[in-house]
Regions:
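Immediate post-signal-peptide N-terminus of mature secreted/exported proteins
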Residues: 28-94
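Amphipathic alpha-helical membrane/lipid-surface binding segments
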Residues: 33-36, 69, 73-76, 80, ...
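Compositionally biased, intrinsically disordered terminal targeting/sorting segments
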Residues: 28-33, 64, 68-71, 103, ...
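Long, heptad-repeat alpha-helical coiled-coil segments that mediate oligomerization
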Residues: 40, 47, 54, 61, ...
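Extended amphipathic alpha-helical interaction segments
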Residues: 104-187
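C-terminal motif of bacterial Sec signal peptides marking the signal peptidase cleavage site
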Residues: 22-24
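Bacterial N-terminal signal peptides that target proteins for export
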Residues: 2-15
Length: 219
């Protein structure tokens, strides 16, 4: 089990949580967090917030990478190596942002699964049928809303790798062809890359809106 970004908010508990991580025991993690006053519902909201933030950062990163690529293609003189280095740095950052997005989505799935399993099992503990029905209705609504959220997040995530692949190709080509002729040969790629990045941004923004709505409903 990975370290949820939520840990960063609780520095006093790092040693305890690190121990749990070493055991790889998800159940022990949740039990310990509940003893510390953090229940699965709160952990799910925190994980969704972390995932939302990672997608916002990834969106900004790819916008920045596109700008750096345009700067290389619009090269009119000066230090071409410097522009290449900046583009390569943007690609490296994009790779890191992409990994963070994937990890945060997995964190959301881990907590959601634990929450819904617990919630479902607790329905049998009710003696009051009206309360049981009300709880089940809320569970079904939350699960439906969650499915919409995770679908949007994964749809956005799937757009990342194709964009990274294109940027990776351009950077690799430029690495050994830092000259005006090589740059000119990449001009035809710009429209395609812009289209891919724009599509990614739209999916990211849709996912972020879903996260905002989910957080609001869970609050």
């Amino acid at each position: 089990m990975r370290k949820f970004a939520t840990y960063q908010a609780y520095p006093m508990r790092i040693i305890v949580l690190a121990t749990l991580l070493l055991t790889g025991c998800q159940g022990a993690y949740f039990k310990t967090m509940e003893k510390l006053g953090y229940h699965k519902r709160e952990l799910l909201v925190a994980s969704v917030k972390d995932a939302r933030e990672s997608q916002e950062e990834a969106k900004e990163q790819f916008q920045s990478a596109l700008e750096k690529f345009r700067a290389v293609l619009n090269f009119k003189g000066g230090d071409l190596q410097e522009k290449y280095d900046k583009l390569k740095a943007e690609l490296d950052s994009g790779e890191s942002r992409a990994a963070a997005v994937r990890e945060r989505i997995e964190d959301v799935e881990d907590v959601a699964e634990a929450l819904f399993d617990e919630w479902q099992s607790e329905l049998d503990q009710y003696s009051d049928e009206n309360l049981r029905r009300a709880s089940k209705k809320k569970l079904d609504e939350t699960r439906t809303r969650y499915k919409q959220l995770i679908k949007a997040m994964k749809r956005a995530e799937k757009k990342i790798d194709p964009v990274l692949s294109v940027f990776r190709d351009q950077v690799l080509f430029l690495k050994h062809n830092l000259n005006a002729q090589a740059i000119a040969s990449l001009q035809d790629e710009l429209v395609s890359i812009e289209t891919d990045v724009d599509s990614l941004i739209r999916e990211m923004e849709a996912s972020i809106r879903e996260a905002d709505a989910f957080i609001k409903e869970m609050g």
